[in-house]
Amino acid sequence: MQHSFIEILRRALDEELARDPAVHLLGEDVAAGGAFGVTRGLAEKHGSARVRNTPISEAAITGMATGAALCGLKPVLEVMFIDFATLSMDCLVNQPAKYRYMSGGQLSMPLVVRTQAGAAGGAAAQHSQSLETWFIHVPGLIVVAPSTPAEAYGLLKSAIRFGEPVIFIEHKRLYTMKGELDDDAPLPMIGKARVAREGSDVTLIAYSAMVQTALEAALQLEDEGTSVEVIDLRTLLPIDMATIAASVSKTHRVLIAHEAVLNGGVGAELAARIGSELFDELDAPVLRVGCPFAPIPFAPELERALLPAHADLLRAVRELVGRASGPAWRRRFPRSAWSWKTSRSSAG
């Protein structure tokens, strides 16, 4: 049976409320269903003491949730749009992210922040941003960005049970996406990426809504004779470098795609790490696709023109496979001969 992203999130919250009396929901209009209807009916089922409306103050909501978590509850708060999670940053950065460290491991912080990100339907510059990189700069936070209904179900349940502060980012464009749910599937691990599609020529790394765009591009490129492996990061902090390394050692070419601006984005961090940790495996520079450094326009046609799309991924992959296999000096020798790691280990 097909379920929408919204229905799957509601089911996950419903089941966790039933499973653990410590789980509480709070946020603006949460008792009335929330801005997108994710929590609809949960207040009637579980009571207004556990599904609670709050004032329109992101800072206050986050502070209340932090206090509740310190007192033994497991709050799941909804910050309506990641654009306004900026108002929660003082508390998130200086309180939940720091308590375990500052207490020497004596305190945990089982707190989940659900928030909506990304451009969809002409919501304009103040309701369309992708600010996930703000959070991955903070030690002590976990950042999750699911790409399908089934992934959202499992990752949300894992986040609620994780025991650490989790920023759970839901792309608005995915809310109407439908998919099937395997009730017997194990819950995904926080910090573990998944190979969404296997391939051998190029590694295409994406997350959230961009995973679907990557899969569509990979399908078209297969008809052109290019095999693209698509990695769904799932968790942006921490990043699963082991899964990435296994793929890069097979394909030797990497493209990273996300909707956020390229400046200081997840792609920039990944490209730097791949370049330093997996340099010997690369036959071409790591390429990135993302938004230009500009606000998201209101006009739908301008919004579409700005956002990275299927065609952008096709161009980038074609550029990667069109390159010769590495710099000229590398092509004169087998891979084992130009590996500085091999040379260093044999010399030592």
Residue ranges and their predicted role:
Residues M1-P165, R304, ...:
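Thiamine diphosphate
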Residues E7-R11, G63, N94, A150, ...:
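Short, contiguous clusters of charged residues that form electrostatic/catalytic patches at enzyme active sites
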Residues R52, E229, R332:
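Conserved Rossmann-like nucleotide-binding pocket used by diverse enzymes
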Residues T115, A206, R335:
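Flexible glycine-/small-residue-rich
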Residues F168:
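Non-catalytic, usually N-terminal nucleic-acid engagement modules in DNA/RNA processing proteins
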Residues G326-G348:
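Acidic, low-complexity mobile loops and tails
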